[in-house]
């Protein structure tokens, strides 16, 4: 995949205060079609509220696509079954997918960046 080396290069050059803000998410979650699932992403230090969180969906054999940006915004074409939220009290972000469909089976990644820039 041509994008993988570029992505690794960009991550290797991440500098600044936000580079020290680490997010942790569960290894896997599962639920039945038609149900609702929530995937959480917890910040290790600092305040998640001072960072924007994005969520990516990666289906097998495909490049990642953005499903949520700036904490809770959906790109054009992403169904409203996908929603994002921030919980400052637990220093975490969540991606919620309602009305699960088989096509939602994928890897999901959270990523943050400094919202002041």
Curated annotation (Swiss-Prot):
One of its GO terms (biological process) is immune response. Residues 45-52 are annotated as: Complementarity-determining-1. Keywords: Adaptive immunity, Cell membrane, Disulfide bond, Immunity, Immunoglobulin, Immunoglobulin domain, Membrane, Secreted, Signal. Disulfide bonds join 41-110. Residues 1-19 form the signal peptide. GO terms for molecular function: antigen binding. SUPFAM superfamilies: Immunoglobulin. Residues 111-117 are annotated as: Complementarity-determining-3. Residues 73-110 are annotated as: Framework-3. Residues 83-97 have a biased composition (Low complexity). Residues 20-117 form the Ig-like domain. Residues 65-97 are annotated as: Disordered. It comes from the Eukaryota. PROSITE patterns: IG_LIKE (PS50835). Residues 70-72 are annotated as: Complementarity-determining-2. Residues 20-44 are annotated as: Framework-1. It is found in: Secreted; Cell membrane. InterPro entries: Ig-like_dom, Ig-like_dom_sf, Ig-like_fold, Ig_sub, Ig_V-set, IgV_Light_Chain. Residues 53-69 are annotated as: Framework-2. PANTHER family: IMMUNOGLOBULIN LIGHT CHAIN. Immunoglobulins are composed of two identical heavy chains and two identical light chains; disulfide-linked. V region of the variable domain of immunoglobulin light chains that participates in the antigen recognition. Immunoglobulins, also known as antibodies, are membrane-bound or secreted glycoproteins produced by B lymphocytes. In the recognition phase of humoral immunity, the membrane-bound immunoglobulins serve as receptors which, upon binding of a specific antigen, trigger the clonal expansion and differentiation of B lymphocytes into immunoglobulins-secreting plasma cells. This is Immunoglobulin lambda variable 6-57. It comes from Homo sapiens (Human).
């Amino acid at each position: 995949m041509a994008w993988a080396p570029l992505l690794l290069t960009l991550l290797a050059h991440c500098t600044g205060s936000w580079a020290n803000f680490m997010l942790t998410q569960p290894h896997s979650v599962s639920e039945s079609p038609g149900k609702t699932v929530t995937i959480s992403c917890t910040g290790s230090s600092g305040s998640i509220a001072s960072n924007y969180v994005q969520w990516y969906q990666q289906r097998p054999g495909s490049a990642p696509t953005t499903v949520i940006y700036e904490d809770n915004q959906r790109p054009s074409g992403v169904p409203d079954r996908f929603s994002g939220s921030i919980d400052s009290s637990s220093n975490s972000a969540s991606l919620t997918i309602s009305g699960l469909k088989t096509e939602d089976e994928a890897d999901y990644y959270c990523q943050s960046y400094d919202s002041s820039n």
